[in-house]
From Swiss-Prot:
GO cellular component: cytosol
Domain of life: Bacteria
Residues engaged in binding Zn(2+): C444, C447, C463, C469
Cofactor(s) demanded: Mg(2+); Mn(2+)
EC numbers on record: 6.5.1.2
Keywords: DNA damage, DNA repair, DNA replication, Ligase, Magnesium, Manganese, Metal-binding, NAD, Zinc
Classification lineage: Bacteria, Bacillati, Actinomycetota, Actinomycetes, Micrococcales
Residues reported in the UniProt entry to bind NAD(+): D54, A55, E56, Y57, D58, S104, L105, E135, R158, E195, K326, K350
Protein purpose: DNA ligase that catalyzes the formation of phosphodiester linkages between 5'-phosphoryl and 3'-hydroxyl groups in double-stranded DNA using NAD as a coenzyme and as the energy source for the reaction. It is essential for DNA replication and repair of damaged DNA.
Pfam families documented for this protein: BRCT (PF00533), DNA_ligase_aden (PF01653), DNA_ligase_OB (PF03120), DNA_ligase_ZBD (PF03119), HHH_2 (PF12826)
Protein name, UniProt field: DNA ligase
Amino acid sequence: MSDTTTGSDAADAAVPATTPADLEAASARVDELRAEIERHRDAYYGETGGTVSDAEYDALERELRAIEDAHPTLRSQDSPTQTVGGRAETTLFAPVTHAERMLSLDNVFSEEELAEWAAKVERDAGRGRVRYLSELKIDGLAINLRYEHGVLVTAATRGDGVVGEDVTQNVLTMGTVPERLAGSGHPPLVEVRGEIFFPVAEFDELNARQLEVGERVFANPRNAAAGSLRQKEEGKSPARLELMHARIRRLRMLVHGIGAWPVRELERDAHVSAQSEVYGLLEAWGLPISTHFRVFDDIAEVAGFVRRQGADRAAVEHQIDGIVVKVDDLGLHEELGATSRAPRWATAYKYPPEEVNTTLLDIVVSVGRTGRATPFAVMEKVEVAGSEVRQATLHNQQVVKAKGVLIGDTVVLRKAGDVIPEVLGPVVELRTGKEHEFVMPTLCPECQTPLKPAKEGDIDLRCPNARSCPAQVRGRVEHVASRGALDIEGLGEVAAAALTQPLEPEDPPLETEAGLFELTMADLVPITVVVRDAETGMVKVDEKTGEAKRVTPFRRKRVLKRDGAFDPAEPWGDEASVPSKSAEVLLENLEKAKTQDLWRILVALSIRHVGPVAARALAGWFGSLDVIRAASREELAAVDGVGGIIADALLDWFEVDWHREIVARWEKAGVVTAVPGHPGPGAAAAAGGVLAGLAVVATGSLEGYTREGALEAIMAAGGKAGSSVSKKTHYVAAGPGAGSKLGKAEALGVRIIDAAEFRLLVEQGPDAIALPEADPVPDAAETAPDGGSAEDATAATAGAAEAATAEAKPKRARKRKAPAAAAAAPPTDVEAGTAVHAEPDGPAETP
């Protein structure tokens, strides 16, 4: 849970500043909120799932929106209130640009807010009665199916609404999505929007199977859907490959809308003029639709539907977190339009979380990667919002005290947003007198080191034994293997626990991450490990035996020969076992990781504040870990994208002996910590790198480049890879799906280039794509027709200039020369244009 103030109180407190100090405070709070919201978005749309409840997240967005409404000068186009979803940054899947942007949905939280939304819709529509379609909001993974002439071309995740990830093969593996649409008369291009989910009834069985094969369990069905769909076959053992396919085949999909098919063509070619009729068309094409939707003549009937569905939501096959309400008339969709992130013709009614009672059996404390000690409630198993819950985080000792819970209490439990378990408080009238208070331990439960705040005034207690606390080492090893770092397949939660805290042998193969690249098969095979809970890190107990659950992740039973004897050639393990495929895969992938990019090595080292952006900047500027370590604070801070705080964090990290030992042992094991062929610190810029002093923004899908590849190409050429367009931007490389950045570049007069020009730019520099000056407009006196007046000449010249401008309009920015480093565009700013009929990411389903 965030330590920041959230909720309606915070939103109500967001009033216009009256002094420069007040405005500065509002600006600082906006920066905090944006960073926190983006962090939660990245977690929610990535594999890890949500880090806060839906209610907490919604409160953060509402507070940010309230401040921006009060101070419009603080609103920007890249604010979370103006953008959609998360980024598509994984290196596993190819980027796919949607033909029509996938928008999000605005939310309402009460019947009063729903009525206010409907009143505005009807007022803006300028007509009498408006019909509304209502359907369940599926809590799953948004998907976009692109069909060309009735044939499936790609299936992609939503991503940021413009560019998603290509998951076509996995979607086809599901077996419920047709490769070819039924019927005839299909348009040349249509996008079908839907939601992929994991059935609630099969969720517990899935997690049981995950544990059997040593895979992590999922916190909820939505995470199961995202984790199952966003995986690849490469590097997986046969057992894990079969598990992957089995998980994918259990996924279900329901479609709820159409994109990239203009309303006029829908009406003309398919005789469809209402959202409810779209579902009939989709069903006729053989696509899976929900039958659970209703059309109502007024908003009061919609409110009744909302209440009825809220009471029965546990009976639905998938998780839901609200009701989507859409204007049924497609013509009104065009008239009402959309904001930069959501249509005005639809909204989502968000339900308050479901609440149940259960018994608080104990409060245990677990320690995470950063040493933070977090208390968890251990409860009697209870079903809430469609799945069984036994544990919930209590965040810190102050939260435990504020909630007033005692061990042994009957407590009220809910799933915030129907996803994250949360203990609300005790049912005091049911106390028997046998309950007792929780006392926060003074020692780390993993290594017995005294817990203490990181600094004076901190609420959280932390274990300072960062080097050898098993929980922290385990967490850092998982981080090294994560997709954002070295991306090592086969080194997940179970493997990390096995390497750092095995039941057998007594001495763990890894005391710290320093020994990771020194591992051998002989280290792996003997390991036996207890199974730990994915959320708390606590040891799981076998319900039949009462003992800790054990697995041997790196060995399997040896197959007997026909004569009943074992093959004596196997050198590892006992006489009945041999190395598993998991062991082979892990060692292979560790070897591959040794040549990962330098910026990924920097991220893997768990240096505070050093994320991918700063790591890329450091790697691009200095070129090697040795040079970074030898740099002064001033040299580090001077790198664009680094600054003083990160510079201090780097210096502090390298001051620690065991940190330097990690680098030394990794290098000795063959990890490459330098960029091959790098000319030296800042050489690309200082020695005339082809983009020295130039700021370049890449947006949309650039052929031949991933998102990360485009950024790296800019920085490798000595340029600054910008994340937003401003008057200081020199070039915008725009591909399909460029969105608002393209619009802003056009408004500012920034040179816009395509993928081919971008390649020339980063390889050869601005001169390779320089454009000639526009021909000068002739003087009016010289162009006057014989016998014509000066006014005639002026008019003729103006007409010629207007015609020339019209002809060149699509390439108007190309009239500029290649900019020099100090060149600046006019300080103009505009709101980006938006599509008006983009189907929102509102999973649609309704009983």
